[in-house]
């Protein structure tokens, strides 16, 4: 097995070590292997391939980090073909929340989410994706 080196803030490393202890992992390497597998499999859901999808991406960052807001604006324009809507709000006193509503293929949405994740100084990134053509029980009600 290869050995790799990763740079990260001390606070994050402490949280990972605590997570490993709390959940019975043998060490942080096991946590990183599982997290890496999950990340790689995240957009490999065969049920979503070749379907039109809708998605929501939420990004939270500190108000002082204007480079994040600039990057969000750049990504919004770069991916205007899939960004159906975008909302910016100030929350919690000194944080900003950017919300993107997306419509596109699995590949285009995963590319967008990947670029958001690669943005430095974000505090949290969350998203969800649903097929446009399948609303399950909701579709049957109409």
From Swiss-Prot:
GO terms for biological process: response to nickel cation. The keyword Transmembrane does not apply. Gene3D superfamilies: ACT-like. Chain A, domain 2, Met repressor-like. Transmembrane segments: none annotated. Its cofactor is Ni(2+). One of its GO terms (molecular function) is nickel cation binding. Ni(2+) binds at residues 77, 88, 90, 96. Transcriptional regulator. Binds 1 nickel ion per subunit. The keyword Iron does not apply. This is Putative nickel-responsive regulator. InterPro entries: Acetolactate_synth/TF_NikR_C, ACT-like_dom_sf, Arc_rbn_hlx_hlx, CopG, CopG/NikR_regulator, Ni_resp_reg_NikR, Ribbon_hlx_hlx, TF_NikR_Ni-bd_C. Keywords: DNA-binding, Metal-binding, Nickel, Transcription, Transcription regulation. Belongs to the transcriptional regulatory CopG/NikR family.
